[in-house]
Amino acid sequence: MIRLYNSRTLQVEDFHPIHEGHVDMYVCGPTVYNYAHIGNARPMIVFDVLKRLLEAEGYTVTYVSNFTDVDDKIINKAAEEGTSEAEVAQRYIDAYQQVRRSLNTELPDITPRVTENMDGIIAFIDALVKNGNAYVTKGGDVYFSVESVPTYGEISHQKLDQLEAGASERVDETGAEKKNPYDFALWKMTDKGIKWDSPWGKGRPGWHTECVVMINNNLGEKIDIHGGGMDLKFPHHENECAQQEALHYNCLANYWVHNAMVNINGEKMSKSLGNTLWAQDVVNELGTNLTRWLVSSVHYRKELNFSDETIATARKEMDKVMKPLHQASVKRQLAGVKQSEGYDEAAYRAFLDCMDDDMNTPNAYAVIFDTVKKINQGLRTRDIDFETVDKLRKSVEKMLIILGITVKNPVVTEEDRKLFAAWNEAKAARDFAAADEARRQLMDRGLL
């Protein structure tokens, strides 16, 4: 039984999908005005792992993650570059998808764009106005009335009188006052940048409405899992939930899952500190496996720190896991033994049990290390039980698949066999120079 922490209830709950055997999951995607940083990469990995876990436990999954391709930042960048908003958005969408591929994430099944859902967004806003949950200012802007939804605050767990001042401006661009300082924009009138016709005049939609409509259009009025970074709980997810409550009388998703933030050398990553790490640069430097291992080494609800120390620790841990897997494969091949038919089901089940417990990756890593320890013990015996060792190896590789980490075991050739024989002969003859040279060649080939 998979259990997930639900931000809405503040509890770890048994997971029961709406439709037996199938899961609908939506994760908020990026506003595409710049390249993805490592903070953007964390939810890519977290929810990719969750999807893999759900599938390993027998569910089919429809995974949707959007692109916000209309926004003031996109418009400003297009103006600076003398190009179109569409060209700016497409450039960063392409780059974002490349990061996903570089991270070995399974691409979402559906990646809707705001600009492709404008008719539905306008219709949704119009319904909110007619339902009395939204109002139109004299300047033609449309705002959602947070006081019209008694449950407002159920995601962030804040009452209206407890919310931080400044979470939403009191006055809009035209100077018309809001009825409540926390009312948020559904539609903004503008004469700048890309805009659409609406019942209230030409303008653009507010951010919070876009995701609700894309969920409804692609998955329906209620889904199983809504995911995203912790920073989206308020106001974005709170405001999504409020709009859905207003029109469809539900909170959009049964499980609200949020990952914590990424720090750089113990400090919050921010443009002002100049410590932004671009995701593609990280993958290029560390590689896919090490990046994913580091990100998953910390529970997804705890802050993740990127530093030289945490990278070094992750690299040592990866070596501790990968080397025995390679050695087990090489020694089996040298002995002329076929691969085992199955895997160690008990070890794999222990790993899944940890992952099923709110994706407890630290405990799951402990299972990996324990299984690797057994592989090492098996390889140190005089007469290796290759069947047992190989089942352990295959169970670890299945664990790593859920973490999105790939294992490429070396294939031993006839030339490799001769080199191993030469190494052993040199050691037996105490010809240390020849032995060292043979060992170096074996290491270069990834066989030691």
Report the location of each language-model feature.
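Alpha-helical recognition segments enriched in aromatics with Gly/Pro capping
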Residues: 1-33, 48, 119-329
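Alpha-helix C-terminal capping/helix-coil junction sites
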Residues: 55, 101, 129-130, 257, ...
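The substrate-binding groove and active-site-proximal loops of carbohydrate-active enzymes
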Residues: 79-85, 109-115, 229
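An acidic site on a long C-lobe helix of protein kinase domains
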Residues: 92, 116-120, 364
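N-terminal, positively charged nucleic-acid-binding surface of large information/translation enzymes
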Residues: 9-12, 18-106
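Structural preference for alpha-helix termini/caps and helix-kink/transition segments
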Residues: 268, 277-448
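Short phosphate-binding/catalytic loops that engage adenosine nucleotides
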Residues: 59, 133, 447
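N-terminal, positively charged, Ser/Thr/Ala/Gly-biased leader segments
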Residues: 98-132
